[in-house]
Design a protein with these regions (language model features):
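Phosphate-binding site of ATP-dependent enzymes
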Residues: 1-75, 104-106
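ATP-dependent carboxylate activation and anion-phosphoryl transfer catalytic cores
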Residues: 10, 14, 67-163
Length: 163
C-alpha cells in the first residue's frame, strides 16, 4: 500500500478536476472515513482553487454534495485512510483529494486540525450530510483521543462527553 499511495500522492501532472473532502476519525488501525463531500464551485466563486473567500462565504459561491458513486467512493476513502495512517494523523480531521482528467484520485493535502465551526467548516458539513450530529462528531474525536492516550473511558466520563 505504501508504494501505491506514493504513486497517487499529489499527482499534479494532469489537470486536476473534481475536488473532494474526506472526513476521518480515529487513529492508526482504528481510523475510518466518516464520508466524502464534493465541492462544486459556482460562477461567483474563485475558480482555480478553493480559496478562503470561497470557504468562509460559501453561500452563493459553492455547493456541496455527498459522494456516493462506487467504485470511486471506495477508492477515494481507501486512499484517504492510507494517507491519514501514513502521516500519523490522529483523532479527527480531513483530507483533500482531487480527481484528474482521467478520474484517478490523488491525495492533495491533510488537515489534521480541521475546522470545527458547524456553519462553515468542511468536517461538520460532511457529518451533517451523513446524518452525524455535531455533538457526536466532537464526542468521537474526544473518545479517540482518550483511547489513544490509554485512559479509561468510564461510563460516567462517557456520559459527560455525550452531554
Amino acid at each position: 500500500p505504501g508504494d501505491d499511495l506514493g504513486a497517487r500522492a499529489n499527482g499534479e501532472e494532469a489537470p486536476m478536476r473534481r475536488r473532494l473532502r474526506v472526513g476521518l476519525i480515529g487513529t492508526g488501525p482504528a481510523a475510518e472515513a466518516l464520508g466524502t463531500m464534493e465541492v462544486h464551485l459556482g460562477p461567483k466563486a474563485d475558480q482555480e482553487v478553493y480559496t478562503y473567500e470561497n470557504k468562509e462565504h460559501w453561500e452563493g459561491r459553492v455547493t456541496y454534495s455527498l459522494l456516493s458513486e462506487e467504485p470511486l467512493l471506495s477508492a477515494v476513502e481507501s486512499l484517504a485512510i492510507a494517507a491519514w495512517r501514513a502521516l500519523g494523523c490522529r483523532d479527527g480531521g480531513r483530507l483533500d483529494i482531487r480527481l484528474d482528467a482521467t478520474g484517478a484520485p490523488s491525495f492533495i493535502e491533510a488537515n489534521p486540525l480541521a475546522g470545527l465551526n458547524p456553519g462553515h467548516s468542511d468536517l461538520p458539513f460532511i457529518c451533517r450530510f451523513k446524518g452525524i450530529p455535531y455533538d457526536e462528531l466532537i464526542r468521537r474525536i474526544v473518545v479517540s483521543a482518550i483511547a489513544r492516550a490509554g485512559l479509561p473511558l468510564t461510563a460516567t466520563l462517557s456520559k459527560r462527553i455525550a452531554a
